[in-house]
Swiss-Prot record:
The protein, known as: Pentatricopeptide repeat-containing protein At2g30780
InterPro entries, per database record: Pentatricopeptide_rpt, PPR5-like, TPR-like_helical_dom_sf
Keywords: Repeat
The PPR repeat ranges on this chain: 137-171, 173-207, 208-242, 243-273, 350-384, 385-419, 420-452
Membership in a protein family: Belongs to the PPR family. P subfamily.
Top-rank lineage group of the source organism: Eukaryota
Organism: Arabidopsis thaliana
A Pfam family of this chain: PPR_2
Length: 452
């Protein structure tokens, strides 16, 4: 569950740690930095060339913008390439000839990026360096706390928070408490999460939408649907109104809890906004529909699937759709997804999925399709089961295809499943249904020989 919270929390983390305050003419800055960034990206992995370009064309970043805005903008633009952004900071820390010290915001940004790069040691080193230079501002503390949050280090985060509270030159902010709420929520430490929220209120720092969103996400991760709903209703009543992130969280929460009516109501509220980042939400709704047999669920799911067009193949989603179509007896659609799974070399190892496929073929009387599927599934390493063979025996028997029925029995005898009482009972019933009493008696004789 904690991994799910990472996905939920990532959309808010930027709000917690973005400390840059660009000048009014930042548009020109962004354009100039973009040109430099593009040149740096063409260099590749040569650290020496990277540093040389900055030496020749990057001095203006901190000489013109002594508040750190230039370096911060370049690090922001290189943020997807964490190691390059950190190289910029390393170069900046080495520029000592101009007597322009790093700002606390540059340290905060470096700490944040080091955390995203999972380099906790570097983040702590930068924090300690800032401390030696008396630059331990709230943003620097918050950045290191967010590093611990991002990496699930609750004890370290709490220890740093206690140190933060002892400082006389700076004090925790609402961002600080948001981080605490987040880290506890991610680790299912609900009581600690609630205690952090209560302390925020005691120190009379007004919570913001991010605070409530992290609370909702924490309750959702812990599957505490009642408190999730109560927090949402509190937002609707209080001074902090729900934002887009809140509605998306609630949509996911309703989907995960199987509350389809509320999920659909929430989707109507935000469906025009579900687009660029629709994937996780849409997939959550698809999962919710797959778990409950509701009217028109196939049509609803296919409408949602149209929003995912162009996305990469997801094995788990494809298997989920195989089971859905099997349960609804949509054999053609089921086989389309099965073929896709074979093409993508997806290996199904759940008996429940196989039984759903078998049942669909049985209800639709598609024994030849079933036989073909079994051959392909066996070659692809899918998990076979005894029910699969029994279904083939039953279907061949119902169609008076006794030679093929007996062929399946012989095939089954050579597998690890072997022949059991039920196998013979199915054969006996098949023969009797068609008035072939003597053949049924022969099968009974075989049973006796096997001691069944």
């Amino acid at each position: 569950m904690a991994s799910n919270f990472v996905k939920l929390g990532s959309q808010f983390i930027g709000k917690l740690t973005r400390v840059t305050s660009l000048p009014a003419h930042h548009t020109d800055l962004v354009q100039r930095v973009s040109i430099l960034k593009d040149e740096l990206l063409t260099i590749g992995n040569s650290k020496e060339k990277f540093q040389n370009v900055l030496d020749q064309k990057g001095q203006w970043l901190f000489r013109t913008y002594r508040d750190g805005a230039g370096i911060l903008e370049l690090m922001d633009q290189l943020f997807p390439r964490h190691y390059l952004a950190l190289q910029v900071l390393e170069w900046r820390r080495g520029q000592k000839d101009y007597c322009i010290p790093l700002t606390s915001e540059e340290y905060a940004k470096g700490i944040k990026i080091a955390g995203r790069a999972r380099d906790i040691n570097l983040a702590v080193y930068l924090f300690d360096e800032a401390a030696k230079k008396r630059m331990q501002t709230a943003s620097v503390y918050n950045s290191l706390m967010s590093v611990y949050m991002w990496n699930g280090l609750a004890e370290e985060c709490q220890s740093l928070f206690k140190d933060f509270r002892r400082q006389t030159h700076c004090a925790p902010t609402v961002v600080t408490y948001n981080i605490l709420v987040s880290v506890y929520g991610r680790l299912l430490m609900v009581k600690n999460m609630e205690a952090a929220f209560e302390e925020l209120q005691k120190v009379k720092l007004p919570p913001n939408s991010v605070t409530y969103n992290f609370l909702i996400a924490g309750y959702m991760t812990a599957w505490n649907w009642d408190k999730m709903e109560a927090t949402f209703q509190e937002m609707k009543r209080g001074p902090v109104e729900p934002d887009t992130d809140t509605y998306q969280l609630m949509l996911r929460g309703y989907a995960n809890s199987g509350n389809l009516n509320r999920m659909e109501e929430m989707y109507e509220v935000i469906k025009d906004q579900v687009g660029v980042n629709s994937g996780p939400l849409v997939r959550a709704m698809i999962c919710a529909y797959c778990k409950k047999a509701v009217e028109d669920r196939v049509q609803k799911i296919e409408n949602l699937l149209s929003l995912l067009s162009g996305e990469e193949y997801l094995p788990w989603l494809n298997v989920l759709l195989i089971r859905l179509y099997a349960q609804e007896d949509f054999v053609e659609a089921m086989e389309s997804k099965i073929n896709e799974a074979f093409e993508q070399k997806t290996c199904v190892n759940k008996s429940s999925i196989m039984r759903a496929i078998i049942a669909a073929y049985f209800r639709c009387n598609e024994v030849d399709n079933l036989a073909n599927f079994v051959k392909r599934a066996e070659s692809a390493g899918w998990k076979l089961c005894r029910s699969l063979y029994h279904c083939k025996i039953m279907m061949y028997g119902s169609q008076k295809r006794f030679e093929e029925m007996e062929g399946v029995v012989n095939e089954m005898a050579e597998t690890n499943y072997g022949l059991v009482t039920k196998t013979f009972a199915i054969m006996i019933k098949a023969y009797k249904n068609h008035g072939m009493e003597s053949d049924a008696e022969k099968v009974k004789g075989k049973m006796l020989k096997r001691g069944l």
